[in-house]
Swiss-Prot record:
This is Protein N-terminal glutamine amidohydrolase. One of its GO terms (molecular function) is protein-N-terminal asparagine amidohydrolase activity. PANTHER family: PROTEIN N-TERMINAL GLUTAMINE AMIDOHYDROLASE. It catalyses: N-terminal L-glutaminyl-[protein] + H2O = N-terminal L-glutamyl-[protein] + NH4(+).
Amino acid sequence: MEGDSRAATASQYQPACPTRDACVYSSCYCEENIWKLCEYIKTHNQYLLEECYAVFISNEKKMVPIWKQQARPENGPVIWDYHVVLLHVSREGQSFIYDLDTILPFPCPFDIYIEDALKSDDDIHPQFRRKFRVVRADSYLKNFASDRSHMKDSSGNWREPPPEYPCIETGDSKMNLNDFISMDPAVGWGAVYTLSEFVHRFSSKNY
């Protein structure tokens, strides 16, 4: 019965944005895509911004496998240096992941995303095990800054075309992306979790 209740709640969930296509999106700039999604949620008042989190996925080696990505929609994973998604923990106790690069539903119920896109660390070599820096959306909007220099090669050419809007910066910084990618709990904002800790903290099954 609990499973039926969760499914019913998920089916009644109203997404925080109209469609995937309505979101601001630039390939390979996932950190900015999610910042823009946080900004959209803040200005449209459908959900409290405090219910939403930016989630950076990386590890010490900057090699994290994620399945069901548009860059490789077959059975194999994409190995990213880092990836960023949005987590919404609704007042009804359901959690949803917004991943603009997945072939899974958008948004995707948390537990489905974990099962299909992240799978388990048990069968993954330790160097590939994922960690998660979870930052409240309001803090992310206030503190994140990027001058996009990480997307230029040694000759100063763009590896991927940058977004058309100006770089995101704060009064204190023009570039602090590495503080968000870092999985050192002593650095940056938010809290850092292992996969099992992340699931235990945010899984809809725990409500």
